[in-house]
Amino acid sequence: MNKTWKKAATVLAFAGIALSATACSGGKAVVTYKGGKITESQYYDKMKESQAGQSTLASMIVSDALESQYGKDVTQKQVDKEYNKYKKQYGSQFDSVLEQNGMTASTFKDNLKTNLLTEAALKHIKKITPAQEKKAWKNYQPEVTVQHILVSKKSTAEDVIKQLQDGGDFKKLAKKYSTDTATKNDAGKLPAFDSTDSTLDSSFKTAAFKLKTGEITTTPVKTQYGYHVIKMIKHPAKGTFKEHKKQIDNQIYQSMSEDQNVMRSVIATVLKRADVSIKDKDLKNVLSQYVSSDSLSK
């Protein structure tokens, strides 16, 4: 499961167990068998003792609190857009990737919505400072467009570079050598990206940003996927901060979202505003990673 999928899978992963809304109502059987039965109350008692059950309850509380406070900021259209982005990225493997991660299309969409709600909470609760923007702008690189050829062996990449230096055609070499099936038949061309892009390996971006328009990497670029030969198609001037403020702010919030301490603080604020009250003393610590149990048991 790569970084992108992990991100999609989210801030709070849902265990695949549902707690009945009437779980503590008493003796209704959820399972019967020869000589006995398992009641809702028995099931509930076991569930609340388990880590999976407590994690599910915590996820339900956080998700409901986020929905209550920021639901107006997230539309189904946004959720569907995110879903279709991942579906396109994984292509024919999408269903198997869902299965490998223990998800259905429905639960994955739930997770995506939780992500979007969490992003909304982050942007409402944590405000960006001019100092943060100044620091981010210093390291910012605008959108560039590149071609690449991905191979599994360093020696193959070195051979491709030599052929290019001898006048070889990048498009033909990409089709012949590249193992990136998504780009090899399109001259190895990738979608434009800037330094805020989180889908590309950092070493790939670093190597690409050093190139001027028309230049090719003179040594193979190693990433988790193999070895790349990169050609810069378009490398524009940096421009002004005002032109890229939106991207800069998105980058800052992206960094915040990857900081566990920041996100724990955001969720804690959401829970305090929700005035959550844990009625079952056995579950008083279910949200202890965010807030003190004393503030929830009333």
From Swiss-Prot:
Membrane topology label: Lipid-anchor
Lipid-binding residues (covalent, N-palmitoyl cysteine): C24
Ranges in coiled-coil conformation: none
Catalyzed reaction equations: [protein]-peptidylproline (omega=180) = [protein]-peptidylproline (omega=0)
Superkingdom of the source species: Bacteria
Residue positions bearing lipid (S-diacylglycerol cysteine): C24
Region forming the signal peptide: 1-23
Location, primary (coarse class): membrane
Protein's cellular compartments: Cell membrane
UniProt GO cellular component terms: plasma membrane
Known EC number: 5.2.1.8
Alphabetical UniProt keywords: Cell membrane, Isomerase, Lipoprotein, Membrane, Palmitate, Rotamase, Signal
InterPro entries: Foldase_PrsA, PPIase_dom_sf, PPIase_PpiC, PrsA_foldase, Trigger_fact/SurA_dom_sf
GO biological process, one term: protein folding
MF terms in GO: peptidyl-prolyl cis-trans isomerase activity
Domain PpiC intervals: 141-234
Function description: Plays a major role in protein secretion by helping the post-translocational extracellular folding of several secreted proteins.
Family according to the record: Belongs to the PrsA family.
Protein name: Foldase protein PrsA 1
Provenance organism: Lactobacillus johnsonii (strain CNCM I-12250 / La1 / NCC 533)
Gene name in the database record: prsA1
